[in-house]
Amino acid sequence: MALKTFKPTTPGRRQLVLVDRSELWKGKPEKSLTEGLRSKGGRNNTGRVTVRWRGGGHKRRYRIIDFKRNKFDVAATVERLEYDPNRTAFIALVSYADGEKAYIIAPQRLAVGDQVIASEKADIKPGNAMPLKNIPVGTIVHNVELKVGKGGQLARSAGTYVQLVGKDQGYAQLRLASGELRMVRGECMATIGAVSNPDQQNVSLGKAGRAVWMGRRPSVRGVAMNPIDHPHGGGEGRTSGGRHPVTPWGKPTKGKKTRSNKKTDRLIMRRRQTQ
């Protein structure tokens, strides 16, 4: 789908670039596959802010997505492609031959009326799901499991994909979008193709208000605060902060490594390339 630009009738319209969603379903979502979603405003169960810059925004309903793709050997027909406010990718409503319906993440080049299937061995075409051990080396995949049966976790965002670059001793070798090379069990499921809506990266919201509609509140820089509020705060006039960048709680940020899962370190063959 293409991008939409607008006549500069206001400053916000001048900068606005959106994805053209005119080809998507214009009705309501499948009611049996949705549930209520309450906005947390970045608060946890104690009511304290655990994620800053969240709050407000339009009310949403959660679409229940099938990330596991474990309904094997039953063909499904794509009924429609839909917008999902909870993610950047588009979703597809599929209807199985036995009457069951499900939402899946829509890959690129998937169209209404197409047939998709999850199986031990299936055709290499967008939307089909199978274990990594049965997918040819070099194939582009998305919605990849990290643990067998847990459901896809890798490459679910708009335009993303993972490339299968090798197989060795029961493991599949994957090249991620970050450049990281890692191993995943060959029994893990993956879906063929790249995720839909690759133009998402070119969207420009045009004004701060549109971000607020999405539940994103303003982000205040530490150097603009007072010393009581942030380690970078204070100083007469504009200052550079005077120390290496830290969070409001004094922990190093911007480049500080935060990964601490030694059990899976051996599965990472090459780390992602950082600046």
From Swiss-Prot:
The keyword RNA-binding belongs to this UniProt entry's keyword annotation: yes
Amino-acid biosynthesis recorded as keyword: no
Pfam annotation, one family: Ribosomal_L2_C
GO cellular component: large ribosomal subunit
Annotated spans, Disordered: 225-275
One Gene Ontology term of the molecular function aspect: rRNA binding
GO biological process, alphabetically ordered: cytoplasmic translation
Family classification: Belongs to the universal ribosomal protein uL2 family.
Function comment: One of the primary rRNA binding proteins. Required for association of the 30S and 50S subunits to form the 70S ribosome, for tRNA binding and peptide bond formation. It has been suggested to have peptidyltransferase activity; this is somewhat controversial. Makes several contacts with the 16S rRNA in the 70S ribosome.
SUBUNIT field: Part of the 50S ribosomal subunit. Forms a bridge to the 30S subunit in the 70S ribosome.
PANTHER family assigned: LARGE RIBOSOMAL SUBUNIT PROTEIN UL2M (PTHR13691:SF5), RIBOSOMAL PROTEIN L2 (PTHR13691)
Protein name: Large ribosomal subunit protein uL2
Gene expressing this chain: rplB
